[in-house]
């Protein structure tokens, strides 16, 4: 049992797991911000542009059930904004990684084969 707890601790404290946990918390908070932006600012403005339409009231009845397609439309707008923000974030992060890789690639690696050939030639000359 003690060994399993130690293994779990080692797993949970790895950098990747902690990074993932932080990303999930930040992502949840970001999702709430975007939902508020869509619900309280974007959709009311879109409603005004469409002649005073209130998306929260868009629904129809099927028997006793109420289909609230206005809320669904707001969820789609939420998704599009979050997906676009993640796309931009990944694009920026990827460009930073590529720049870093290019910097590493640009540093010349000493030509070890050339050095070895020079050493060999010098040793041959010394033996003569």
UniProtKB/Swiss-Prot annotation:
One matching Pfam family: MscL
Localization annotation: Cell membrane
Keyword Transport found: yes
Protein's name in the database: Large-conductance mechanosensitive channel
Keywords: Cell membrane, Ion channel, Ion transport, Membrane, Transmembrane, Transmembrane helix, Transport
Gene Ontology terms, MF aspect: mechanosensitive monoatomic ion channel activity
UniProt organism field: Listeria monocytogenes serotype 4b (strain CLIP80459)
Coiled-coil zones: none
Transmembrane segments: 11-31, 70-90
Membrane topology according to the record: Multi-pass membrane protein
Recorded GO CC terms: plasma membrane
Cleaved signal peptide residues: none
Cross-referenced InterPro entries: Mechanosensitive_channel_CS, MS_channel, MSC/AndL, MscL_channel
Similarity-based family: Belongs to the MscL family.
The keyword Protease appears for this protein: no
């Amino acid at each position: 049992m003690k060994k399993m707890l130690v293994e779990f601790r080692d797993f949970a404290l790895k950098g990747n797991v902690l990074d993932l946990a932080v990303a999930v918390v930040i992502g949840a908070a970001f999702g709430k911000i975007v939902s508020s932006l869509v619900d309280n600012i974007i959709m009311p403005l879109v409603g005004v542009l469409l002649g005073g339409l209130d998306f929260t009231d868009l629904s129809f009845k099927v028997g006793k059930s109420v289909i609230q397609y206005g809320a669904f439309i707001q969820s789609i707008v939420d998704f599009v904004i979050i997906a676009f923000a993640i796309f931009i974030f990944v694009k920026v992060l990827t460009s930073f990684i590529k720049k870093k890789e290019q910097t590493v690639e640009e540093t010349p690696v000493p030509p070890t084969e050339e050095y070895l050939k020079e050493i060999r030639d010098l040793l041959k000359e010394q033996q003569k």
